[in-house]
Amino acid sequence: MERTPNPNNQPVELNRTSLYLGLLLVFVLGILFSSYFFN
């Protein structure tokens, strides 16, 4: 898989947003699982 550097693309920002989305997803899933366990 070869990736050509694109000046219009910002891989750092994309990685940061994907990282934040992943953390948010894990956080929401943790809250849901904790609510299921506590109830």
Swiss-Prot record:
One of its GO terms (biological process) is photosynthesis. It is a single-pass membrane protein. GO terms for cellular component: photosystem II reaction center; plasma membrane-derived thylakoid membrane. The chain crosses the membrane at residues 18-38. It is found in: Cellular thylakoid membrane. It holds the Pfam family PsbL. Keywords: Membrane, Photosynthesis, Photosystem II, Reaction center, Thylakoid, Transmembrane, Transmembrane helix. It comes from the Bacteria. PSII is composed of 1 copy each of membrane proteins PsbA, PsbB, PsbC, PsbD, PsbE, PsbF, PsbH, PsbI, PsbJ, PsbK, PsbL, PsbM, PsbT, PsbX, PsbY, PsbZ, Psb30/Ycf12, peripheral proteins PsbO, CyanoQ (PsbQ), PsbU, PsbV and a large number of cofactors. It forms dimeric complexes. HAMAP family: PSII_PsbL. Belongs to the PsbL family. One of the components of the core complex of photosystem II (PSII). PSII is a light-driven water:plastoquinone oxidoreductase that uses light energy to abstract electrons from H(2)O, generating O(2) and a proton gradient subsequently used for ATP formation. It consists of a core antenna complex that captures photons, and an electron transfer chain that converts photonic excitation into a charge separation. This subunit is found at the monomer-monomer interface and is required for correct PSII assembly and/or dimerization. NCBIfam families: PRK00753.1 (NF001972). This is Photosystem II reaction center protein L. It comes from Nostoc sp. (strain PCC 7120 / SAG 25.82 / UTEX 2576).
